[in-house]
């Protein structure tokens, strides 16, 4: 089931915690167009990661959080209830962002829209790549995708939405 954004909420890129509402490809692509940084520093990684930790703790979400830029891990946190398996999922989802330059959830949704799955049609090892929600590209204006912010521990759409919510807040503060 897909839905269209309510015109009265046109600035909200994704509804928060409505698992029955699956975003359309257009909505997911809009998120990527709008959630762009002017620059992305080590301090930005720390601040964004800390914001994600704060949001996850408010919800008692058992997640691991990771921020990578140009192959370097700039931030990592594992909250209570997360496991080493979440770190493996983070790596697999991040590799999808690095390879496709799009959010892991969007990549999976594009395959589903074609009537197939990422696992069936990508020809990539599912032990190495996972087109499941939770990894979002760090895109710098005039540069392109330079990294990824990733969450693992919730159902994939909730992982995706948590990252988008944090990016909306972070970038809404003029960064």
What label would you give each PLM region?
Residues 7-18, 100, 120-131:
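Phosphate-binding glycine-rich loops and adjacent basic patches that engage nucleotide phosphates
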Residues 58-59, 141-142, 169-175:
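Secondary-structure boundary elements
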Residues 2-83:
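Intrinsically disordered, low-complexity terminal regulatory regions
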Residues 59-124:
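Structured interaction and signal-relay segments at domain junctions
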Residues 119-168:
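Extended hydrophobic
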Residues 42-46, 111-120, 172-175:
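Short, positively charged
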Residues 98-101, 160-175:
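Short, solvent-exposed cationic patches
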Residues 25-30, 112, 116, 139-141:
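Short amphipathic alpha-helical segments, especially helix-boundary/capping motifs
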């Amino acid at each position: 089931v897909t839905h269209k954004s309510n015109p009265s909420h046109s600035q909200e890129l994704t509804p928060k915690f409505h698992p029955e509402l699956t975003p359309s490809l257009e909505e997911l692509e809009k998120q990527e167009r709008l959630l762009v940084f002017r620059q992305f520093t080590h301090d930005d990684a720390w601040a964004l990661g800390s914001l994600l930790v704060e949001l996850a703790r408010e919800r008692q979400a058992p997640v691991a959080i990771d921020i990578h830029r140009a192959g370097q891990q700039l931030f990592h946190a594992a909250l209570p209830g997360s496991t080493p398996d979440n770190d493996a999922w983070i790596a697999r989802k991040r590799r999808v962002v690095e390879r496709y330059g799009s959010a892991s959830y969007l990549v999976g949704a594009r395959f589903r829209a074609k009537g197939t799955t990422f696992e069936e049609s990508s020809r990539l090892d599912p032990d190495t790549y996972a087109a499941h929600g939770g990894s979002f590209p760090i895109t710098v204006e005039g540069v392109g995708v330079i990294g990824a912010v990733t969450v693992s521990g919730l159902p994939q759409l909730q992982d995706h939405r948590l990252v988008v919510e944090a990016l909306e807040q972070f970038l809404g503060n003029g960064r």
